[in-house]
């Protein structure tokens, strides 16, 4: 239901109503009713799975068709048959404030047998708060987390309440990628001895992955995979070829899709396609030697909260396209790519209809899951509309 009250020449998105807008007025409908919407290539239906969530941040589909949903204020719920459970017990002590709280959740590849999952959160500690990664086991009765273990925490906690990152992507080898923002102190993103403003790569036990560009730690923290990131809140591995992509918030303009590679520097705050909120220039321009270019950027910003690559069966027309959940314009961006992976266009869906879109995930059946970052947030499902 609608909301309640790295290329040499990166692709750029600018608002074009004729191309991106949907000439469709969405009106309130009863809960669980489907809203039918025409897009450029296919008709879709949007259905509310459950409402009444408080600032949901992440969703994962369970093997039996239920869902796990995190709420930023510090709750994890199981959604089954259109009903959200009582909060799952066993979460560690969190820092909840500003942009911090319970953040992403990801199932271990062997979850069906092990019940293991990972989650990120902001936690309190010496000096303030910072981002941490945890592993746990969901109990068989789905009421509590067991064997909760903190695998990793960033090495410098501060009192700021923003730019914690942080989503998780799991590689075919079981290793974990996740991002941490600059924590609102932009120069930290250029310090390889500081975990802030970086993409990290860890083994399932929290130790640095074998491909660490800073192995040994003498030139940088060994968990760091790439640097120069402002606030990466989306991360995904393309299941077709294993390519890693991130999406991150710019300032006033300059949101980016990046393709991180080990040891590379993505420029923040030395280069950016945006400006400071004051209107002042950032760094030394939009490009400079030694810094990687994004594969795509937005000006003005859309405030991207998550990214996935569509590889499902339900929408073959969208195969290989990026799906980006956006907060600022309350939209789902479909970034069209050709067979070579080059970006060829963008379609903006659901703009202003459901609220701030925080997460997007392709479900096992090819449907698309969204959560809305609102006080009265929703878990939504996009499916292919039946033939009229």
Which residues does each predicted region cover?
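Bacterial N-terminal signal peptides that target proteins for export
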Residues: 2-19
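Bacterial N-terminal signal peptides
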Residues: 16-29
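Short, conserved, GDST-rich strand-edge loop motifs in beta-rich repeat architectures
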Residues: 178-196, 254-256, 260
């Amino acid at each position: 239901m609608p909301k309640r009250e790295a290329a040499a020449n990166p692709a750029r998105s600018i608002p074009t109503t004729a191309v991106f807008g949907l000439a469709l007025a969405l009106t309130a409908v009863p809960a669980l009713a489907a809203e039918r919407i025409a897009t450029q290539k296919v008709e879709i239906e949007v259905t509310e799975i459950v409402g009444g969530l408080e600032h949901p941040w992440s969703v994962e589909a369970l093997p039996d068709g239920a869902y796990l949903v995190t709420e930023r204020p510090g709750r994890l719920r199981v959604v089954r048959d259109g009903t959200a459970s009582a909060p799952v017990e066993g979460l560690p002590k969190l820092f909840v404030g500003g942009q911090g709280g319970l953040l992403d959740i990801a199932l271990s590849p062997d979850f069906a047998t092990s019940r293991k999952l990972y989650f990120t959160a902001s936690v309190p500690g010496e000096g303030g708060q910072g981002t941490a990664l945890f592993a746990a086991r969901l109990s068989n009765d789905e009421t509590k987390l067991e064997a909760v273990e903190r695998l990793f925490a960033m090495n410098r906690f501060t009192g700021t309440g923003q730019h914690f990152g942080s989503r998780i992507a799991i590689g075919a080898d079981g290793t974990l990628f996740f991002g941490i923002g600059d924590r609102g102190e932009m120069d930290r993103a250029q310090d390889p001895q500081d975990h802030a403003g970086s993409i990290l790569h860890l083994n399932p036990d929290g130790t640095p992955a074998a491909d660490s560009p800073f192995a040994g730690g003498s030139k940088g923290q060994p968990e760091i995979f790439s640097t120069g990131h402002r606030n990466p809140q989306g991360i995904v591995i393309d299941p077709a070829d294993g390519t890693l992509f991130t999406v991150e918030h710019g300032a006033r303009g300059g949101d980016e899709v990046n393709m991180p590679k080990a040891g590379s520097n993505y420029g923040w705050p030395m280069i950016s396609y945006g400006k400071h909120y004051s209107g002042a220039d950032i760094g030394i321009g939009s490009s400079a030697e030694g810094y990687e270019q994004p594969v795509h950027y937005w000006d003005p910003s859309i405030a991207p909260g998550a990214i996935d690559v569509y590889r499902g069966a339900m929408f073959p027309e969208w195969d290989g396209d990026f799906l980006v959940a956006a907060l600022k314009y309350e939209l789902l961006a479909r970034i069209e790519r050709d067979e070579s992976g080059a970006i060829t266009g963008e379609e903006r869906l659901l703009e202003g209809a459901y609220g701030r879109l925080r997460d997007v995930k392709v479900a096992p059946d090819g449907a698309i899951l969204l959560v809305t970052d609102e006080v009265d947030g929703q878990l939504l499902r996009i499916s292919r509309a039946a033939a009229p």
